[in-house]
Amino acid sequence: MSENTVMPIVRVAVLAAGDDGGRLTEMALPSELPLREILPAVQRIVQPARENDGAADPAAAPNPVRLSLAPIGGAPFSLDATLDTVGVVDGDLLALQAVPSGPPAPRIVEDIADAAVIFSEARRRQWGPTHIARGAALALIGLILVGTGLSVAHRVITGDLLGQFIVSGIALATVIAALAVRNRSAVLATSLAVTALVPVAAAFALGVPGDFGAPNVLLAAAGVAAWSLISMAGSPDDRGIAVFTATAVTGVGVLLVAGAASLWVISSDVIGCALVLLGLIVTVQAAQLSAMWARFPLPVIPAPGDPTPAARPLSVLADLPRRVRVSQAHQTGVIAAGVLLGVAGSVALVSSANASPWAWYIVVAAAAGAALRARVWDSAACKAWLLGHSYLLAVALLVAFVIGDRYQAALWALAALAVLVLVWIVAALNPKIASPDTYSLPMRRMVGFLATGLDASLIPVMALLVGLFSLVLDR
């Protein structure tokens, strides 16, 4: 048997319409290849580019016309069919015509095995330039993170300034790259901008000489907040706006507390209470802050007797859907920042071995208040962050206790985490328990009163814990 396989062919005549009445071309075409693969060559043969009018490849046009072969007076063949499948034989006359707009015709298969392969998800999502670009972006992000980690470790362990210079260069290069690709690829720009938060924070934190302390945290928080505000102003992606809002608000909160710790000597109780209080304020004011950042047009309500104000321009009304999306993204970011500040403050309050019982009350009340506050929000992202407050806190305390060699406390944190998971499982098996509509009106009022009482009790307990009452009484 010969080593070369002979490809079956069919000899046909192809008619292509044109201004001069059409052009008939005889050609030999492979009969077992899909039309999708042979049509580009057929199109180049029967419709050559004209020299005078500079016509280019129709596939390169802004809205290319999809062409296919068809019998004279018949419907175009499916692009996934072969000439053998549709019954084309030697001597047939075919026409090259446009595929009508609308949903594509069902693919033609010859047996069940072919159908299983053709209609599988793996065949529909084959490897292509998009996957290559995505892999390159992931590789670049991984390189940035690995380089940042290595530089920080080198600076901390050896004390050499080389690590500081390298991490500063990585931060600068990442920031420039994120700004450079903003107009070309919004997704890549957002990914690089989010990744740049890590080297920026590391570069600013390592910029303060001496032992690590409040000044390092102050400078790192300032860098993160500044870069977040810059990225948030130019981010076209709603998810990017939410992320940068969360990092900006968290950075500003940590900046205020770290600034106070740099100026005065304050205890961990004061730091924790300040972070929890900032998180509570941010969460309560999330709706107002998000509306302000989205720049909603303020309503003009005339006084009695005043003339009716003019209607809003159509451009403002047409821009309202975009502003609503931006407001929702800001709202999600503000809620996330409030949860992160509350968790950080709770860890600062009870991570030490001699934590006060009042500190534990603040931690539990803040977590319970966040869970009860989730009933107010309709957004799934906001609910997820508020309900995840307790889980983030349990995991953070578990890690802190293990690092501090407090394994008994870590077991208690693990038990609390198991109880929280059990609550989720019960709610998943009985959805009515987690639905507020199934509760009576008196029960809803009781839950609202409990949530208000927990929030109102936090500030007096914080004042008692930090010694404000003792300071006033001693004077």
From Swiss-Prot:
The chain crosses the membrane at residues 132-152, 161-181, 186-206, 212-232, 241-261, 264-284, 333-353, 354-374, 384-404, 409-429, 453-473. Keywords: Cell inner membrane, Cell membrane, Membrane, Transmembrane, Transmembrane helix, Transport. GO terms for cellular component: plasma membrane. It comes from the Bacteria. Pfam families: YukD (PF08817). Disruption phenotype: Deletion of the gene impairs iron-bound mycobactin utilization and EsxG and EsxH export. InterPro entries: T7SS_EccD, YukD-like. It is a multi-pass membrane protein. It is found in: Cell inner membrane. Gene3D superfamilies: Phosphatidylinositol 3-kinase Catalytic Subunit, Chain A, domain 1. Part of the ESX-3 specialized secretion system, which is required for siderophore-mediated iron acquisition and for the secretion of EsxH and EsxG. Part of the ESX-3 / type VII secretion system (T7SS), which is composed of cytosolic and membrane components. The ESX-3 membrane complex is composed of EccB3, EccC3, EccD3 and EccE3. Belongs to the EccD/Snm4 family. This is ESX-3 secretion system protein EccD3.
